[in-house]
Amino acid sequence: MEFSILADSFNKMESTRKRLELTQYLVELFKKTPQEVISKIVYLLQGKLRPDFEGVELGVAEKLAIRAISKSSGIPIKKIEEEYRKGGDLGHAATTILEQKTQTTFLVEDITVERVYETLFKIAKLEGNRSQDMKMKYISSLLNDASPLEASFILKILLGTLRLGIAENTVMDALALAFSGNKENRKILEHAYNVSSDLGKVAEVLATEGLAEVEKFKIILFNPIRPMLADRVKSEQEAIEKMGNEFAAEYKLDGERVQLHIEGDKVVLFSRSLENISSYYPDIIEKIPKTIQAENIVLEAEAVAINENTGEFLPFQELMHRRRKYKIEKAVTQYPITVNLFDILYCNGKSCLELDYKERREKMEKVVKEDDFVKHIPMAIVKNENDIEDFFENSINAGSEGLMLKTLVSPYQAGSRGSHWLKLKREYQNELGDSLDLVVIGGFFGKGRRTGNYGTLLLATYEEDEDTFTSICKVGTGFSDEDLDQLYQILNPKVTIKKNPRINSEMEADVWFEPELVIEVVASEITLSPIHKAARDKIRKGAGLALRFPKFTGKMRVEKMAEDASTNEEVITLYQGQKKVAHDKSLM
C-alpha cells in the first residue's frame, strides 16, 4: 500500500476537530487498505508500532531527526532548527525544508506503508554503541524517497508527535462501519479489544476473517485485560440508592493497581494503563507463585508501599522510587510493599469474567493462600448505612483512602466504567468531599520564581459520551519547585501546535498539551461557570461546572490513562451532593 494514501488521510484528519468527519475519513482509509496491512495502519493511527503491553518504543530524539533531515536534504542543521522554532513542530518544519531540497536522489525506492512500518520497527529494536548511527541511516533512507508530506508524517510517528485527536472508540466505530456496514457492531469489537488489549489484532481478524471470528476473542494468558473502572459516590446513602440492600465493601488502598498473569514460576505484571511493569516488582515475581494453588491464573491487586516496622500503609508516591531504571534492588529494600488481591479474572484455562463478584471472590480466596506478603483486601457484606459507616471507619483507621463498593451479582466488565463498582473516599475537612483525577490539557508560563516552568495548568474532566476532555479549572497552587520542574520535563514533549480535537475549552492556554497526564486535585467546592466546559448545559443552560480554589495534592497519577480521569457524571454527582449537604445544614 502506498504510504502517500496514508499521509493524505493523516493530512485530512489533522485539518478537522469534528468526530463525525474523523470517523468518515477513517472509514474511507480502511476501505482502501489491503487486509494484510490493516493492523499496521491501526497501530500507526495510535502513534505506536505494537500494543502497549509489548513495550515497543521508537526512542528517537529531535536532535537525531534534525540530523537525518539535514543529511537527506543537504540543508544545514542551523536552518532546520530555525524553521522548527518558528512553528514548534518538526514534522511541519520538515515539509518546508524538504520542499527546498538541494540533494538529488537518482535511485528512488517506493515508499509503502509496509516499508515505513518495517523500517520504524527496526529503529525501535536497535540498541548498543552504533544504534544512533544506524537509526539516522534508516531515517535518512526513508526521507530520501519520501515526498515532503510523507516525510512530515514519518517524522511525527518517529517522534511521537502525531496528533490526530482520534480515540480508540472512534477507530472502532470506523472499523465497524467499514467492514460490517453497521456502527452497532462496535460492541463486538469493543469486547474483543477489552479482553485482548490489541486493537491492531482485532482489526486484522475483522478484515481477514470477519465479525464472527472477532466474537470468538478470549483471554490469552500474558496479554493484559483492560481493567474495569468505578464510578464515585458522595455518601453512604447515595451508595445504597444505587446498589440496593446488600453489596460488598472493600478497603480502597492508595497503591498501584497491578494485573498479575501467573503460570508456574512465570509471572508478568501489567499496570492499569497496560504497561508491562514486571521489572519494578522483582519481589512480586519471586514471592507470588508460592501462594498460588492453580495451574495458571490472572489476578488483580493493589501493590501498596508499607512501613516495614509498623505495617502501616504509605502513600502511592512512595512507589515511584521503583520506576527508576537502575538500583531497583535497593528500591525494593527501601520501599517494601504488600500485594493486596481483590479480583480473579482467569483460572485454570477458563475466564472468570462472566462469574458474579461473589463467586469470583470465593474462588480467589480458595486458590490464593495469604501470607505476610500476599493478602486478600479486607471485604465485608454491608446492608445499611451503619454497616458502611462502621467498615468505612475501620478502613480509614487501617490507612486506606475509603471503600470500593461492589454489587454481588455483577460480572467483571473489562474496559468499562459503571454503577456495579462505586468508590467512596474519605472527606477532606473544609474541602470538596473528594479528590478529582484531572487531565492536564494546557499550560500558562510561570512568572517570578516560576519563570522557565509552567506556573499554572489548565485541567479537564473526561466526557465519556463524546470522548472529549472538557475544561474545569486552572490550578497553580500546591506545587513545590520540584513538582514544577518535574511537570515541565513530563509536559514539554506533549506540547502540540494547536489544540487537540478532543479538547473542549473556551479558555485559551499559552500552550496546549496532548491530553495524557493525569494529576490529583482537591477544591473547596464546585460552582457553575460561564467559561468552563465540564458538564456544560447539564445543570443550567449556558453554564458548565468549575472547581473553586483547586489545589494540587502532590500526586501525579502516572498509572492512569487520560480516559480514566474523573468524568463529568462524577463531577455532577459531587456538585449535587454538596448542594444537598448545604440544604440539609440550612434545616438544622
From Swiss-Prot:
Keywords per UniProt: ATP-binding, Cell cycle, Cell division, DNA damage, DNA recombination, DNA repair, DNA replication, Ligase, Magnesium, Metal-binding, Nucleotide-binding
Gene Ontology biological-process annotations: cell division; DNA biosynthetic process; DNA recombination; DNA repair; lagging strand elongation
Enzyme Commission number(s) of this protein: 6.5.1.1
Molecular function as annotated in GO: ATP binding; DNA binding; DNA ligase (ATP) activity; metal ion binding
InterPro entries named among the record's database cross-references: ATP-dep_DNA_ligase, DNA_ligae_ATP-dep_bac/arc, DNA_ligase_ATP-dep, DNA_ligase_ATP-dep_C, DNA_ligase_ATP-dep_cent, DNA_ligase_ATP-dep_CS, DNA_ligase_ATP-dep_N, DNA_ligase_N_sf
Pfam families listed in its UniProt record: DNA_ligase_A_C (PF04679), DNA_ligase_A_M (PF01068), DNA_ligase_A_N (PF04675)
Disulfide-bond pairs as recorded: none
Lineage top rank: taxon: Archaea
Biological function: DNA ligase that seals nicks in double-stranded DNA during DNA replication, DNA recombination and DNA repair.
Entry's family note: Belongs to the ATP-dependent DNA ligase family.
Protein name from the UniProt record: DNA ligase
Gene: lig
